[in-house]
Amino acid sequence: MGYVTTKDGVDIFYKDWGPRDAPVIFFHHGWPLSSDDWDAQMLFFLKEGFRVVAHDRRGHGRSTQVWDGHDMDHYADDVAAVVEYLGVQGAVHVGHSTGGGEVAYYVARYPNDPVAKAVLISAVPPLMVKTESNPDGLPKEVFDDLQNQLFKNRSQFYHDVPAGPFYGFNRPGAKVSEPVVLNWWRQGMMGGAKAHYDGIVAFSQTDFTEALKKIEVPVLILHGEDDQVVPFEISGKKSAELVKNGKLISYPGFPHGMPTTEAETINKDLLAFIRS
């Protein structure tokens, strides 16, 4: 564990576990979480002989709570800084939710940085918000409401999201895991309110269409069909049609936070793709 300082002076926290000569998997977390959200994957792939790396996005987790730069361009630049510092070119990049958008932007923005493969899990691309050119997207008012809830009572908001739609705990018959809810809350409250507030705009209004089209490496897209946060029909399904060399796996009944609730299945499919 340590920090990388970016060209604009932001300290980015990272984890780097495993043998230096092992194949590398670089994990990108979702909003408003941290690298801790990848525990189930990092421990699994460490045992499988990989070197695993994850960072806390600027303003998230243990990274600097800077007030600006909360957009996909800066997110991608921060990833590039970590990659260069650790010398982990040629990694497989795995992103969940907003992290999936970050992966797409990084791969497209840095074509000269070797990347082995990319994985988008419950990811926000190609575009979440409804526009004239994206009539199937979610109304902007949905994201305005997220910002309003964060502004009014961030602590309560960060309990309601994981206790409800994020893990599908609001579905009939679902068994709520309070420790999972509290871990989500803990990660969210570690980060900065300004970063999270601006991050809602970044993940909802960024159009990743051209970035997806530029990706040359193999891409695995994993998405739950019961994702209440990033609906499958407007995201994973469309992204699979935009990438040149993509594979889509959808999971009936799986929620947005499936890397946690369905870790065994997700890890198995990730491992098969990475080793293929």
Swiss-Prot record:
Query: Catalytic residues per the record?
Result: S97, D227, H256
Residues spanning the signal sequence: none
Keywords, alphabetical: Hydrolase
Q: Which SUPFAM superfamilies match?
A: alpha/beta-Hydrolases
Task: Outline the extent of the AB hydrolase-1 domain.
Answer: 23-254
EC number of this enzyme: 3.1.1.35
Q: How does activity depend on temperature?
A: Optimum temperature is 30 degrees Celsius. Stable below 75 degrees Celsius, and retains 69% of the original activity at 80 degrees Celsius.
Report, from the record, the phenotype seen after gene disruption.
Answer: Disruption mutant is more sensitive to growth inhibition by peracetic acid than the parent strain. The sensitivities to hydrogen peroxide and acetic acid are not affected.
Q: Which InterPro entries match?
A: AB_hydrolase, AB_hydrolase_1, AB_hydrolase_fold, Epox_hydrolase-like
Reactions performed catalytically = 3,4-dihydrocoumarin + H2O = 3-(2-hydroxyphenyl)propanoate + H(+); peracetic acid + H2O = acetate + H2O2 + H(+); a percarboxylic acid + H2O = a carboxylate + H2O2 + H(+)
Q: Note the superkingdom of the native organism.
A: Bacteria
Instruction: Give the pH dependence of activity as annotated.
Output: Optimum pH is 7.0-8.0.
**GO molecular function annotations of the record:** dihydrocoumarin hydrolase activity
Query: Which Pfam families does UniProt cross-reference here?
Result: Abhydrolase_1
The biotechnology note for this entry reads: Can convert substrates at high concentrations to desirable products in a short time. Thus, DCH exhibits significant hydrolysis activity, with stereo and/or regioselectivity, toward the methyl esters of bacetylthioisobutyrate and cetraxate, and is expected to be applicable to the practical synthesis of these compounds.
Regulation affecting activity:
Inhibited by the serine protease inhibitors diisopropyl fluorophosphate and phenylmethanesulfonyl fluoride.
Family listed: Belongs to the AB hydrolase superfamily. Bacterial non-heme haloperoxidase / perhydrolase family.
Assembly and binders: Homodimer.
Annotated function: Multifunctional enzyme, which shows esterase and perhydrolase activities, and is capable of organic acid-assisted bromination of organic compounds. Catalyzes the hydrolysis of 3,4-dihydrocoumarin. Aromatic lactones other than 3,4-dihydrocoumarin, such as 2-coumaranone and homogentisic acid lactone, are also substrates, but their activities relative to that of 3,4-dihydrocoumarin are quite low. Also catalyzes the hydrolysis of several linear esters, with specificity toward methyl esters.
Q: What is this protein called?
A: Bifunctional esterase/perhydrolase DCH
| Organism of provenance | Acinetobacter calcoaceticus
